[in-house]
Amino acid sequence: KNLNCCFIQWKKKRRMLEYRRQRTDKEKEEQMTRQIITCRGLPFWSWNGKLEENELRRQIRIFREMGFGGFFIHARTGLATDYLGKEWFEALRVSIDEARKVGLQPWLYDEDRYASGSGAGEIGKNIHFRRRSVEVKVLKEPEYRTDDLAWFAGKLSGTMLAEPRRLETGADLRPGESFLRFYVKFAEADSWNNGGYYSDMMNPDAMREFIRMTHEHYAAEFGEEFGSVIPGLFTDEPNCSTWTENMEQKFEARYGVPLLDHLPELFFEVDGCECSKIRWQMANLRAELLESAFAVPVSEWCRKHGLLYTGHVFGEENTVTQTKNTGSVMRFVRHMDIPGLDVLSDHQLIYEAVLQTASVARQNGTSRVLSESFAGSGWDLPLFAQKAGMDWQYALGVTVFCVHHAFYTLRGEAKRDFPPGISFQSPYWKQAGGGRRGGRGGASAACGSSAGIDLVLEASGRLFAEGSRDGDAPPAASAQRSAPGGDRIRLRRRAYDGGKRFHRERAAPDWKG
């Protein structure tokens, strides 16, 4: 009797365990299916010609046939329709309608070309919002100008400055001294910004104007589609220069130190000191200003309007380029719902950047990490190289690929705009299956565990103090000497050079990566 009772209890327990296992397997399968849909590739759809309804609808159906999950609508070189004009919004309306019909997600992009934040060059036309930098000119004789920041004298030898002293107007030099003239240089108008200017992305008023003329315009036209048909918005390559309006007042308010008295430390090793507290404070302040002026308000605007915020910053390749262009990549992308990065070409091995971005995603509690990939790889980029480039990123935590890019047209200079093209202009587009494979690979990375590090500690402070003179990257030898991980930088450069040689000489289509 006791044996029978034990046997019955064992059978019940076994059935319960089997039920739980089946339920767990079913839940995992359902989770995997959901992730495959959300992790499918999203190409940059380059609007670079005269936009016409029938052609827009045709190309969206091609994206569906290729297995993509959606697309980023991206104004690019060659656009013959007025950006943010009446025809632009009509083309968007057509594209959103067709995407809804075929089950794709149309994502917005916040700029004409890139980098985000200049409003097609319009914002910088207000000189208060214009990009600027702090510069130094070394002269043998004094040259005093009324609009300069400050003047110094000192004994200069290469990057070493000894016995610097601040000068007043009309002061003479002593024997052996050089004259250092510090001034602000404003960005010039250029064709890339349609005859306008790059904006100052550390200026909160400039970025409020950017949101008003771009984001609010989209909300007025398509706000009812936000969060449903239109899932989110892409920001591309925001970055900061070395100066902003009232920088000296902001610096003193933040640190209690008069910045103008210490300008030489931004450019030179003063009295033999490689490290400078002023240099560290300046790099840190630039990162804080970019974050508070750009990342925070755009992120808050997106959440208020039901949009996911994604994209990447400029110069995330390593800590040297990050210090120069943003101060800190991780501080910026932590405000994104889907943190991202840009892996240019098919042999740029920026492992640190991928690990940093994946670490931010984990800290934010999300599994989605976006990579804009393959820009500049050339028209001859083979499928096996694309697979290899995606696989190592999956292993380190990337789950969604923004494939660069799908040309609307190849007319004129558009064909030279950072190929390859992955849409119907490429002979292998029907065989590529990048969208479907991207969904499976991304889902595996999202549901499983990557080979990457769970947490990345960004040790940027030393580089802020040692290697960020004028917010610029130091010479290669200095960068390798002063930056943490200098040996890894050298190894990566050798791998990069080897990759270039491999792709010039490739003759092995069966290469397994």
What are these regions (language model features)?
Residues 17, 37-42, 50-58, 70-71, ...:
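Carbohydrate-binding surfaces of carbohydrate-active enzymes
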Residues 17-47:
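Generic start-of-chain signal for non-secretory N-termini
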Residues 65-70, 175-190, 258-265, 269:
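Short coil-to-beta-strand
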Residues 118-223:
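Catalytic and substrate-binding clefts that recognize carbohydrates or anionic sugar/phosphate headgroups
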Residues 13-15:
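Positively charged N-terminal leader segments that act as targeting/secretion signals
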Residues 48, 154-157, 164, 170, ...:
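Structured loops at beta-to-helix junctions and adjacent beta-edge loops in soluble globular domains
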